[in-house]
């Protein structure tokens, strides 16, 4: 293979890996949020309010799982072009070991507390909206189309999280819970902007986007929401270790249980 062919193959491999990691993000985030439906985590709506967050969270979860289906399905077709073997969405969900998933660690922890759910959704949805907005300009028509569909839904995801951050921030006890949750998950935020070889190669070809360029807008969005909730971020966005993060297949202790639960839900029959 000549130099030009090798570069093209590297770009195609990176593009496939880029789509797969985004599919994994949406899959795990959607599953985690779906688990909260009927769990009692979301308080009943107050009399006279227009929002019932249980069904709204379920709507967001379904949207993320649809996005995951589109991305994983596309990743499988891209793999077929590279290897001659196509894996379906279900193959990619059920046929990979935990260390072959490339999702962000941010979306993995169990939702045992509403404050943790709200913080995670705020941080992730603000990132996802910036990411998919940028991807609408992808040189790949399929990815750009998936991104355009996502951008129609993601503002609702972000606004739902912001609204709940404001609601929890209004009470002293709930604001303390929100602050504790923020302290706990903040170390995972560096991975959102990790510019590894996959991201850089996908961005250089015009297929993807370098996550590092999303950081200023994300910080402005998150800082504004936290300020309105009478909170502040714990510190600067940390630098993620490229070899010890979800993008490298290194996951939290919760992930094996998450994956087992996700597969049970998708079991035939």
For each feature predicted by the language model, list its residue ranges:
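Helix-loop segments that flank and shape redox-cofactor active sites
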Residues: 29-59, 127-143
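Internal, conserved structured core segments that host functional sites
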Residues: 104-159
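Hydrophobic packing residues in well-ordered alpha-helices of helical domains and bundles
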Residues: 19-22, 26, 57, 118, ...
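Acidic/His metal-coordination segments adjacent to aromatic residues that form catalytic metal sites
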Residues: 2-24, 93-120, 171, 185-207
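Conserved alpha-helical segments that form or flank metal/cofactor-binding pockets of metalloenzymes
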Residues: 60-95, 161-164
